Amino acid sequence: MAQEYDYIIVGAGSAGNTLATRLTEDEGVTVLLLEAGGPDYRFDFRTQMPAALAFPLQGRRYNWAYETDPEPHMNGRRMECGRGKGLGGSSLINGMCYIRGNAMDYDGWAKLPGLEDWTYLDCLPYFRKAETRDIGPNDYHGGEGPVSVTTPKAGNNPLFHAMVEAGVQAGYPRTEDLNGYQQEGFGPMDRTVTPKGRRASTARGYLDTAKKRSTLTIVTHALTDKILFEGKRAVGVSYLQGSTEERVEARARKEVIVSSGAIASPQLLQRSGVGPRALLESLDIPVVHDLPGVGENLQDHLELYLQYACTQPVSLYPSLLWWNQPAIGAEWLFNGTGIGASNQFEAGGFIRTREEFEWPNIQYHFLPVAINYNGSNGVKEHGFQAHMGSMRSPSRGRVQLKSKDPRQHPSILFNYMATEQDWQEFRDGIRLTREIMQQPALDPFRGREISPGIEVQTDEQLDKFVREHAETAFHPSCSCKMGTDDMAVVDGQGRVHGMQGLRVVDASIMPIITTGNLNAPTIMMAEKIADKIRGRQPLPRSTAAYYVAGEAPVRGKPMRDVTPAAQ
């Protein structure tokens, strides 16, 4: 006899945990939350210590470790596509950068038919609802939400301050809050870390409250194989429990909600018979509903590291040496303080590279050490780096099922750098970053350019560097987009077109990727749609002011002009 619940949520990640928590706030509403990974072990420093963020990306316990097909514009490289596995999903292994995106992202969504209630001022109350910011609430920030947000503090690494000042000296705006009135410019970067220095995943923030409720059933190591249908209505799921091949069925009285992320959500829909007819028929999967957009429109952020030697011994290089790590770990474990308590992304910025961009098209994360995001290729000396990436690439990829076997990864192609705009943005971005790095604020610290290296100057040389060294920022999205056009998969409430009792709620339903990291927007979307599912009135629209660049120039006069013309 299959167990029966009101709602079945597939995926205990940033969206799924938010939904499970909010839906079970209503008395008597029962929810089954299925997670293919394991628990979020609180004693495992790899997922709980912010500074250890590279560790989960190196293994398979917490990471699906997908790979792309050979990327045609990236020398045919198979590129990493890490996704979180375990309670918390990608909030269990991400870089913990709390960035909401630009107000214009959401106003842009709201111009699309059917998405009129996704303006920034409609979304802002849900960002606030989800958040508790350590320095207190205001018009932009919450004080009572499940997500702990920590702001950078005085006395942190001097390189953070110097990099922000260098951005301002290069002629760009200063902003005190990248999630407040004005995203554009350089400033401190908030992080999803608790006041005790622990990673604030959605498992910690949401599930710690909800899992005490008898109406919420959480099953880990449960890999969902298929959504079950009667006609066009979703009525349940079948999943594999543990490492066995035994299938367990569960029934949903109201809805099945797919929150498996931008790779696994389209994969599950396709495996269940909802997707492009030709693809399903080629795999001998009975077509429940021909929906051509499932798995299409895939987007991501691509980024580069520009690395510099540091002439003063202030970088985090010593913390990479094994003999220094026990003391760092002990301070974090017992006091929740020190290097271990920060993700070390405490400064960043957003700029427009050209006047034709209405809002920023480049994001910076600054890091006071020279190392790859996944912890590899650390430079054996004091150094620092800027992560520089383009925000709204016109390139589009896709996710396609390769097999009926739920354990086989799908075919993933982001089609990175497929347009001339991509190449222009990266060339501009590298050159502008070099101008920023040459400003007086970094004079006390700046040594030689380690990467790309000062000899890399022409368009052709820069393009070669991008092809060989650009990496994902781990922001896959948009593969089950909201909208009303022929390629839309869901409506503005996440309901799958042409189906009943079936929703998708996660980063895959974004129509266009947002300007920045995706964890905060994903949680916001789940908060907003949770109210729709519960039949509640939406939170009142915000009246907060927000910055629109309009005719404002991209930048002012730099303090030190280092362009070739000036030389």
Swiss-Prot record:
Provide the residue positions that the database annotates as binding FAD: 6-35
Question: Which catalytic residues are annotated?
Answer: 475
Q: Name one GO biological process term.
A: glycine betaine biosynthetic process from choline
What PROSITE patterns has UniProt attached to this entry?
GMC_OXRED_1 (PS00623), GMC_OXRED_2 (PS00624)
Q: Which Gene3D superfamilies match?
A: FAD/NAD(P)-binding domain, Glucose Oxidase, domain 3
Kindly report, in one word, the top-level EC class recorded for this enzyme: oxidoreductase
Cellular component, GO annotation: membrane
Q: In which pathway does it act?
A: Amine and polyamine biosynthesis; betaine biosynthesis via choline pathway; betaine aldehyde from choline (cytochrome c reductase route): step 1/1
Q: Which reactions is this enzyme annotated as catalysing?
A: choline + A = betaine aldehyde + AH2; betaine aldehyde + NAD(+) + H2O = glycine betaine + NADH + 2 H(+)
An example molecular function term from Gene Ontology annotations: choline dehydrogenase activity
Query: What is the role of the protein in this entry?
Result: Involved in the biosynthesis of the osmoprotectant glycine betaine. Catalyzes the oxidation of choline to betaine aldehyde and betaine aldehyde to glycine betaine at the same rate.
Name the family the entry cites.
Answer: Belongs to the GMC oxidoreductase family.
What's the protein here called? Answer: Oxygen-dependent choline dehydrogenase
This protein's encoding gene: betA
